[in-house]
């Protein structure tokens, strides 16, 4: 089933309440119809999905059957091969993870845009480090700060373009 046929709206992620699974709530829209809602308390249980009305329950059942007919996902985890069945719950959980990652990427992008004019940004793996110009916003000063960043994080990538 195409992802754009199933959309989560009114999405709320509660990171502070996420323990073993993601704690969230969202309306589930199928084919432009507000079919129901999904929620997970974040305690390690499965995602609960409920229809708002008879048509919503029918659409959720149809979506569940369509997704259930899809091949399972095979992943490698800690040296083992795992088979994850295609279910509506797993599909919605994956949408949730993508939405959270998209939000985090946007947050990082905005932070970088804000900080670039005032300092050097060094990316080291998944981490970002900020080195302010202070009074060294000259070509020599910038190079000095880049050298400090490279000394502290030898494999880092400098995101500034001069």
PLM ranges: what are they?
Residues 1-162:
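Terminal leader/tail segments of proteins
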């Amino acid at each position: 089933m195409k992802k754009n046929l199933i959309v989560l709206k009114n999405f709320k992620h509660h990171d502070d309440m996420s323990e073993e699974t993601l704690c969230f709530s969202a309306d589930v829209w199928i084919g432009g119809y507000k079919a129901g809602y999904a929620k997970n308390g974040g305690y390690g249980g499965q995602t609960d999905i409920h229809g708002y009305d008879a048509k919503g329950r029918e659409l959720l059942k149809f979506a569940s059957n369509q997704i259930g007919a899809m091949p399972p996902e095979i992943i490698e985890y800690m040296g083992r091969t795992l088979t994850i069945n295609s279910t509506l719950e797993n599909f919605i959980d994956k949408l949730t993870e993508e939405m959270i990652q998209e939000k985090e990427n946007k947050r990082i992008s905005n932070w970088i845009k804000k900080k670039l004019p005032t300092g050097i940004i060094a990316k080291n793996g998944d981490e970002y480090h900020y080195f302010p110009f202070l009074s060294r916003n000259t070509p020599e000063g910038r190079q000095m700060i880049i050298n400090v960043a490279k000394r502290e994080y030898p494999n880092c990538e400098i995101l500034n373009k001069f």
